[in-house]
């Protein structure tokens, strides 16, 4: 809610205290929170000054640490897209994190799922905020695929046609993240310091449109 409201009010560079400002550590929740943070204006963990509330990603369990590392790497790899999207926000005042009703306000479903948003023009995210079950900690999230576009799962490349809703289940290491078809997603190889390292290699992911697929 605060992210959506800040976008409505023109405060686009909004971040969260990943892991929680207070309260006991919850490694699974922190992983899911980090997945959301990777598609936010700023990705950071934070808490009040208390040694008992240590939020460093590498002090969680081995699996949780690996899952969070994957998200930090993904954020680094997406930096060309993030940079372009931030420049677009600066130039047009269209939010970086966009509630669905900004682009699809004519459809009532755009107002129904508070967990779903657009990150720039091409990425549709629906982060999971419920605990998982089983050894893989699988959790589900309802996702609406809007418009007449075709959407592709960022992790598996599975295709979903627009105009439908699906219940998506994901293990701890993944979350519902989709790329709009008919566009090219600019990325780069992982680098530990993406903000200060000059771009030398551009990776282009091409996603066919509905007519080309």
What are these regions (language model features)?
Residues 4-174, 179-180:
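Catalytic-domain carbohydrate-binding cleft regions of carbohydrate-active enzymes
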Residues 172-213:
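Accessory, solvent-exposed terminal regions and/or long lumenal/extracellular loops of proteins
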């Amino acid at each position: 809610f605060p992210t959506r409201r800040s976008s409505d009010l023109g405060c686009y560079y909004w971040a969260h205290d990943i892991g929680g400002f207070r309260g006991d550590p919850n490694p699974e929740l922190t992983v899911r929170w980090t997945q959301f943070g990777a598609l936010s204006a700023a990705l950071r963990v934070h808490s009040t000054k208390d040694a008992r509330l240590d939020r460093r990603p590498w002090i969680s369990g081995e699996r949780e640490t690996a899952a969070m590392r994957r998200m930090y790497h993904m954020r680094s790899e997406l930096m060309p897209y993030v940079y372009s999207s931030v420049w677009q926000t600066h130039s047009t005042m269209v939010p970086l994190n966009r509630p669905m009703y900004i682009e699809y306000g004519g459809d009532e479903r755009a107002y129904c799922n508070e967990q779903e948003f657009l990150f720039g023009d091409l990425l549709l995210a629906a982060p999971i905020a419920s605990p998982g079950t089983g050894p893989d900690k699988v959790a589900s999230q309802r996702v609406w695929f809007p418009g007449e576009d075709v959407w592709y799962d960022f992790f598996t490349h599975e295709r979903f046609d627009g105009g439908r809703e699906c219940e998506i289940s994901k293990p701890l290491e993944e979350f519902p993240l989709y790329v709009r078809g008919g566009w090219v997603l600019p990325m780069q190889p992982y680098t530990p310091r993406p903000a200060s390292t000059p771009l030398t290699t551009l990776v282009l992911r091409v996603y066919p449109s509905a007519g080309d697929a």
